[in-house]
Amino acid sequence: MARQQTKKNYSLRKLKTGTASVAVALTVLGAGFANQTEVRADEAKKMEVKESEKESQYKTLALRGENADLRNVNAKYLEKINAEEEKNKKLEAINKELNENYYKLQDGIDALEKEKEDLKTTLAKTTKENEISEASRKGLSRDLEASRTAKKELEAKHQKLEAENKKLTEGNQVSEASRKGLSNDLEASRAAKKELEAKYQKLETDHQALEAKHQKLEADYQVSETSRKGLSRDLEASREANKKVTSELTQAKAQLSALEESKKLSEKEKAELQAKLDAQGKALKEQLAKQTEELAKLRAEKAAGSKTPATKPANKERSGRAAQTATRPSQNKGMRSQLPSTGEAANPFFTAAAATVMVSAGMLALKRKEEN
């Protein structure tokens, strides 16, 4: 009985051991199938994530290339702005110089006008004095002519009296009283002749003085007329120079106004382009955020799929695989820190604002190129 009981117990233990072995084998076989299914799903998700990452990296490289191009365009645009500002400074300097020359010429014209007025006054005064001198000269000429006529008449009368005196003296036919009277008349005639000669000499001297004064006034008049003509020529040349400077000043002001209008127009275009590019930058940022969200969803799905087998009981091989699978999300986290989801992680310079500025510079450069 004891031996039979022992055999029975041994058989039961053997049966239990076999059953347990079969259960273990079935468990291992089921785990193998599950692991194969899980590995295939992981590989598909890995490929999808890799494709998405490759596409993001490609877009990043393309955007970096566009970034470099836009930087070059921006640099050229800045060079053009600097050149325009330098041109503006030169035009302002020319405008200032032309204004100074204009004011100097205006002062010179005013001085010449004043000198011309002074010469006109002097010329009028000289002309009036010349007219007075001419009238005096004509009056003296008339007096001199009258004096000469009177002198001739007195000489004729004196000769007549001399002849009569000589005749009376020779003939002794006249009385002493008549002789004395004739002598007195002769003496008076001689005195009148001397007085008339003195007056004649004085008139002759005055006439010569007036003639000299007249000659001097004539010379002064000629000099004044020459100066007036020269001054008129200088004034005309100054006016022509003033017109030329005024024309150059007007042209410089027109160029400066055109440059200011171009500058205002450029500012307006820049503002419009900035608004457009802000909208484009916003859309680009939204697109990047959407792609980032999709990548995050894929990573979350992958992480959830890799954590599920770790909760089932298994042997050392299965637990090792589960541990290996559990380490993958941390690796994906490291990879995620290197992916340009928003541009800041992989490349701190590549931000949405920087992309907006670069795109705006590129659009502005293209528009200016089309206008040119």
UniProtKB/Swiss-Prot annotation:
NCBIfam families: LPXTG_anchor, YSIRK_signal. It is a peptidoglycan-anchor. The keyword Repeat applies. Residues 125-169, 226-246, 260-274, 295-304 have a biased composition (Basic and acidic residues). InterPro entries: LPXTG_anchor, M_anchor, M_repeat, SMCR, SMDRR, YSIRK_signal_dom. Gene3D superfamilies: 6.10.250.460. Belongs to the M protein family. C repeats lie at residues 124-158, 166-200, 215-249. D repeats lie at residues 275-280, 281-286, 289-294, 296-301. A motif (LPXTG sorting signal) lies at residues 339-343. It holds the Pfam family YSIRK_signal. This is M protein, serotype 2.2. Its main location: secreted. Residues 125-191, 211-274, 295-344 are annotated as: Disordered. This protein is one of the different antigenic serotypes of protein M. Protein M is closely associated with virulence of the bacterium and can render the organism resistant to phagocytosis.
